Design a protein with these regions (language model features):
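Conserved catalytic cysteine-centered active-site region
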Residues: 1-32
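Phosphate/pyrophosphate-binding loops at sites that engage ATP/ADP/AMP, CoA/4′-phosphopantetheine
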Residues: 131-148
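Glycine-rich phosphate-binding loops at beta-strand->alpha-helix junctions
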Residues: 147-159
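Acidic-glycine-rich active-site phosphate/pyrophosphate-binding loop
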Residues: 1, 34-41, 101-106
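Acidic, glycine-rich active-site loops and adjacent beta-strand->loop/helix elements
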Residues: 9-14, 37-43, 83-87
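Condensing-enzyme catalytic core mediating Claisen C-C bond formation in acyl metabolism
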Residues: 47-127, 131, 135
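Flexible, glycine-rich active-site loops centered on histidine and acidic residues
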Residues: 24-59
Length: 159
């Protein structure tokens, strides 16, 4: 028995899926969650615009989340806390992606494809992420020096 839904927000979809899985375990609706995150972005990318395609593509990630007392793997990570944030920006837009592009009136129209001002997005996101991480660590009473690994983004090797 289980449930699933589609959440296509590219670089954040895995983190939102993990948050949902953690919440399901914490509230007792699940003991174990397999979070599979297929990202199919290539069909709505503007391949002639490097800012819009260089970090995106088709990929899938998966993670098993479970209660600590049920975990048996030698490779375990404890979720100490979760915190998500979204912020609207006109510097990155999907314009309904696949749905909008299927309308015959929009075939070949640039505004029907994903678009981003990559450098502007980078300048918006970096300070927001730094504040998010340091604030969350502070709320968890975890010194920055004690952090050995962060999973921030499933982008390509160029990032």
């Amino acid at each position: 028995h289980g449930w699933g839904y589609d959440m296509n927000v590219a670089c954040s979809s895995a983190t939102f899926g993990i948050q949902t899985g953690v919440d399901a375990i914490r509230n007792g609706s699940a003991r174990r969650v397999l979070m599979v995150n297929p990202e199919i972005c290539s069909a709505h990318l503007a391949w002639e615009d490097r800012d819009c395609h260089f970090i995106f593509g088709d990929v899938s990630t998966a993670v098993i989340l479970e209660r600590g007392e049920d975990a048996t793997s030698d490779n375990q990570w404890e979720v100490l806390g979760t915190r998500l944030q979204t912020r609207f920006s006109n510097n990155i837009r999907n314009n309904f992606g696949f749905l909008n592009r299927a309308d015959p009136s929009g075939v070949g129209s640039r505004d029907k494809l994903f678009r981003q001002e990559g450098r502007k997005v980078f300048k918006e996101v970096c300070p927001m992420v730094a504040e998010q991480i340091t604030g969350h660590l502070g709320d968890l009473s975890v010194p920055v020096e004690d952090v050995r690994r962060l999973w921030l983004h499933q982008a390509n090797l160029n990032m």
